[in-house]
Every structure is written in structure tokens, then in C-alpha cells.
Amino acid sequence: MVENGLIGRINWQNLFKIAIFFGLLFLMVAPATAWEWTAHKKIVDEININLPSDVQKNLKPYLAVMKEGSTYPDTLPNDKINHGYPGSYSQTNTWLDNGKVAYEKGDYREAAWCFGVASHYITDTYSAPHCGWIKDKEKYWQIGNQLSPKKHDFHYSNLNNMLQYGNERGKESIA
């Protein structure tokens, strides 16, 4: 195993920080893009820009793969329950773990795919349609286009708490 770059720094705490980053990034980007596939792809662009330079270098050739992964869960039949908490928690863990293993093996294409899929489940957890299963998503998207993004500085003890918090905030936004 190589002990430099991301691999030397990667541990569960770092993966958790990456997951938090995905979540916080969503809070800044999502209202302006209003939950179409373009939102997931824009989030991937922001993630790529903010990665450590060595990781960015390794994953950049596979940015399109990461974007494709970020929309993949929406193509899965019968996966709706996993787009909101608590289903998103197990999916996020699975895809982050798979991405970590692929990255450590040097399979950056697979890592990019996995991290893209994980980003989808994290960001959907914060989306009101996935928290309350509102029926009029078009109205939600129209309202979302009128919102101004805000950056939040939250601290979580673990990924589960972060996703639970996102789910609660999403439900509040449709109340």
C-alpha cells in the first residue's frame, strides 16, 4: 500500500469528513439548481475543485464517470426508500467503502464512480422531496430556483447523525 497522498491520510475519520463535505456542499449548491440531475453533476464539479491536489489529479480523468455515478441511483427501480434517511445512511456507507477500496487499489475509475454514487445519496438526504415524499416535485423545484444558497458550518459526531439532521431539515422545509 502506498503511504502518500490520500491513501496515507484516509481513515474513517477522513471519510466522514469527506461525507460532511458532500453534505455541506449540497447546502450551498442545491437550492440554486433545484434537484434535477444537473444539480448532482454540479455538486460533483464542486467536489472535484475542493479535493486535495493529489486526489484531484487521480480522479480528474474520471470526472465524467463520477458525474454519471452521481445520477445512477435515480435510474434504479424500487430504490426510492434509499434516497432519504435512514436508507441513505447504509447506501452512503457502502459506496464510500467501495470507493475507498477501489482508490487504495489504484482503480481510480471505479473510485470515481463509487464516490459519485455516494454523493447522490448524501445530497438527496437533504432534499425535501426525499424527506417527506412530497408529490408536487415540480412546484418544489420552482420554489428552489428562487432560494439563495447559504453555507452552514455544522459539526457531527458521525455520518448517521449528519444524514439524520439533513432529513429533519428537509422535512421542515416542506412543513
Predicted regions and their residues:
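Short active-site segment of divalent metal-dependent hydrolases/proteases
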Residues: 123-127
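Bacterial N-terminal signal peptides
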Residues: 17-28
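N-terminal secretory signal peptides that target proteins for export/translocation
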Residues: 1-13
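N-terminal, motif-rich segments that launch catalysis or mediate targeting to/interaction with membranes
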Residues: 30-117, 128-175
